[in-house]
Amino acid sequence: MRPWVPVTGASPHAAVGPAWTTGRRCVGVVTTWWWSVSYVERQVQIIDSLYRAMDASAENGYTDAACRFRYLPEEDGSLGIDSSFFYTIGGVSVSALLNDYGDKGCADLVYDLHDVMYKDIRFGESIRSRMCPRGVNPVPSAPTAPPAGLAAFPSANRRTERCLVWIACVHRLSAVGEAGSLNEPEAARLANDPAEHSNRHVDALGRQQLVCAHVVAGVASDGFGVRAGEERTGARGRHSGSIKPLDNLVVETPIEAARSRHRCAGRPCPRRHRRPCNASKSHRPMRMQQRDRGWTVWQKDFSMLTPLSAGFQHRVLAQQLVARRGRMQPSVVQIGVGRIRADVAGRVAGQDALGRIGRILPNAVARLSIAVRFLRAQSINHSIQSKRDRRSWNGCSKGQRRRGFISIDKKPGPKNKLALMFIREPDRFISIDRNPARRTSWL
């Protein structure tokens, strides 16, 4: 696939940094001059703009999908997430709460990342059916046309504006209730309960949109999710064997996505390079920097993501999910926050609200990265791949390929214990406020 190419004028920041074009030697140049603006001031402006846009959407009566969130640093330096993700899809309110790790399995709320991001989906049944929990039939409800002030934007610009800036934070989302499922009486009660609805709604697909938490649980190339406890067999596409969602939980950095996409014309690199092969232009993979330094690059560059680089990374992630020759992909769970476009009144609502949080919370990001790296090792060790695909992975020795690219799950040590602690006790890393009363008074 071609690298992500922005549409000129699609964003107020489209002129920041170079445009990504096909054949560019280094696609990861990051410009940082505009980070000199005070973080606190910009954060306040961005959050205020977000809420103004949400209010404008609510005033137009457009409440087909809603999302509320806030990311705040805690006093102890951890990543505080005062969040509950509220959706009203087809008249059913679904509150996706950050859930602790246990045996509850993956979320029932399955979201098709590729279709929502890159296909011209109109406001209708396709998105509602994907976002509804299993067992809850989408009910025809709110108007399926965007507000009048948003109809003029062409779909191409809408797709390119849908950039993600995402943090390496492993979490689970479940539907309303600790059990993670909605029965019909409960859904009906929530649909008619005003207390369950926020007055700050934002259209999940519109131009003034906030890219809400994307949950991709067991996504394969055909775009279908694997529900908790289900086994995926070779019934659709070229899947073989079965998939256990917990074993396939991974958050993949742009660096890892670029490295795993490297193929050297479909065979192992003849020189067995530990880094991606630069022998010819056709062999050169997409990557953020000329030198691939793995997790060091990710942790350093996390605080310097421009909207352009964010869009490129998300493009790589989408390719990783949906364009890998029909093979079952590792599950990806991510918190993603995109920019919202100009709202109905024409105000520019700002950039990403999350991209600079690593700048002030380096310890939290590092701790999460360790946990993510452990989960990536677990995922690859248990993922279903053919022998040919394992051999074609570059950037590691034969023994590492045999064990699954990286194998820190085989080596006991403090990082391993930290990762296991993150899985078992996520509240020590992410503060979760489950009190509904406090969720309604953020500003």
From Swiss-Prot:
Assigned GO CC terms: extracellular region
Subcellular location: Secreted, Cell wall
Protein keywords: Cell wall, Cell wall biogenesis/degradation, Secreted
Taxon lineage: Bacteria, Pseudomonadati, Pseudomonadota, Gammaproteobacteria, Lysobacterales
UniProt superkingdom: Bacteria
Function, as annotated: Cell wall protein that resembles the beta subunit of human chorionic gonadotropin. Stimulates growth and change in morphology.
UniProt region (Disordered), positions on chain: 263-292
Origin species: Stenotrophomonas maltophilia
Name used for this protein in its record: Chorionicgonadotropic hormone-like protein
Basic residues: compositionally biased ranges: 263-286
Protein family per UniProt: To mammalian CGHB.
GO biological process, any: cell wall organization
Signal peptide (UniProt feature, chain positions): none
